[in-house]
């Protein structure tokens, strides 16, 4: 794949990430959520998380990395490259994303929503800022 296409790919993915982040922000800004809104917040988290790790993967591949096979690899390599800072919280987000895709349990849902509001949303905001600076290069 030519360099130009790889460049466009991560930038296009980043644009989609920003749209997902804007949707997630609506839930975060609302604060107290009904059960139905919690389900919507979880879905918004899932979309945002998926796009976040794919942005990391595409950007790292643009930088020459080739051995990224999933979100865990992308997170680890992005942490090593200094793109993301809190590797532990990113791995917590990975675990939460796995939980939301394999089971629905009201208690788990509330735990995930709490983590999204307090931990993961700030991670996504930080990633957005970092990628904006890289976009401007």
Regions found by a protein language model. Name each.
Residues 1-137:
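Solvent-exposed interaction patches of small proteins and small membrane subunits
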């Amino acid at each position: 794949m030519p360099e130009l296409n790889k460049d466009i790919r991560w930038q296009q993915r980043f644009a989609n990430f920003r749209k997902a982040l804007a949707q997630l922000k609506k839930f975060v800004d609302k604060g107290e959520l009904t059960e139905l809104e919690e389900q919507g917040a979880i879905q918004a988290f899932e979309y945002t998380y998926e796009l976040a790790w794919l942005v990391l993967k595409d950007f790292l591949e643009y930088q020459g990395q080739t051995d990224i096979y999933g979100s865990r690899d992308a997170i680890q390599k992005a942490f090593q490259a200094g793109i993301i800072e809190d590797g532990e919280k990113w791995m917590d987000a990975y675990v939460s994303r796995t939980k939301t895709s394999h089971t629905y349990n009201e208690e788990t849902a509330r735990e995930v929503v709490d983590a999204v509001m307090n931990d993961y949303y700030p991670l996504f905001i930080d990633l957005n800022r970092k990628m904006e600076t890289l976009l401007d290069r």
